[in-house]
């Protein structure tokens, strides 16, 4: 045999043979051939670049018509190669076995190293006269093109070659990082040079590795070769399928010794470790914000670019991340692949399932350093922190009002637009908040799930129960800075403050009358509509307001739940009790601006004002 050339370690395929290989096998073939060529260049053997290497570097198919005519197809070659390139085995080793079949004429016995001989050189000294494969390869070349089926051990070389066989002999001059394979160093160098030689004409995006371009192409084609046998979900990368399979097995093989937490993906463990170290190594040049993951920084950069390349085919909505598009599509398909083993509830996003599981475990891993309050969702902690900082980053462009959560701003905007997306199927009434619809539905069902442990009284809303409990405690934590008056509810204090400011932001479009509460405006509108939706089952009398119906019912029951602690007198309305208490305190909060006379009840002041009105008319 003559000196070793690239064609001695290369495999060529016909069109039919190439089509028998799947994408993973084709990509691996490219990488192995390029690596073998680079190794020959490194050893000073390859002089001119073969056509095959030029094709592979340009991302073209590794055959042409001229080469196809030269290669005769052996019987059964298609199966032969596909079998040798099984993904579940070492495909690289399989390719190297195919390479070595070219040297079968030398005889297998010439390739075998006897037990006890640690290098080709030692065996050559002992045997002396073999003319086969060992004559084709130098010691260093044997190391690079070894086949583990025939070679026992090539780890020890002569002193002259030892410097080439270190653990990571290929070192980057730019940053000092070492690699065990020359092709890995070549790929790494592109990070420093930012050469993206593999460009997709469809979207203009460029990559520094051909295999990354191949993967990216699948985004445009929608091609998903890798399907889960368990649930049928398909993926465009085999690594994504392997990661997905762990969901079904429940395996968590990556454990953090420091806190005992386990993960099913090694990258998740790496990310988790940063929580303990607090490291944020990836910084945005645009705004200076730092992240603990490079992928998070990449996603963040899209915010500055404003780019939304991932478009939904169903509704046209665009997203800046492919994962967000995947999640969004499940709205259209109704697909909920993530199921809770505890209660059977299913979700369309894995993160929602993770959050849901904490309901069963009671886990609250996100703790506020300011007050110690813990939460089961990180976003809730972020919102909570704004209570301490007073930050309100979400501002309404219409009126300038600011909010500490985006959801509150979204709800607020509906005041300006008049949008009411949540409709009651029972009566057709619409609401601008989902919580309002939920509360409204209880009117139809009559359900009162919230019960007071103190007195047994039941309520339709949890907020009403919270308000009611304060009656038993007598607590009034909300105090007016203007006049010192205290209230048991923050909403009552907010309403009260408008007395001092005179603010009436809620205006009726029908008659122009303004109110200081949205609920008062809502009740007022019923007057124009003539609607009386709240009907007494006892006598059939109808009312504009639910509170009026509640007060009316007391006539039938004779119930007087509001008792004066001073004298024991009981009343059927809380407002009547409030008026009564003034008798004991001597307080006269209602003052006439005309003459300065004060009264303990608003109605008495109203009556008094008429005296001045009559006096003015007489003049």
From Swiss-Prot:
Matching SUPFAM superfamilies: beta-beta-alpha zinc fingers, KRAB domain (Kruppel-associated box)
GO molecular function, one term: DNA-binding transcription factor activity, RNA polymerase II-specific
Domain of life of the organism encoding this protein: Eukaryota
Subcellular location: Nucleus
GO term, biological process aspect, one: regulation of DNA-templated transcription
Pfam families linked to this entry: KRAB, zf-C2H2
Job of this protein: May be involved in transcriptional regulation.
Protein name: Zinc finger protein 724
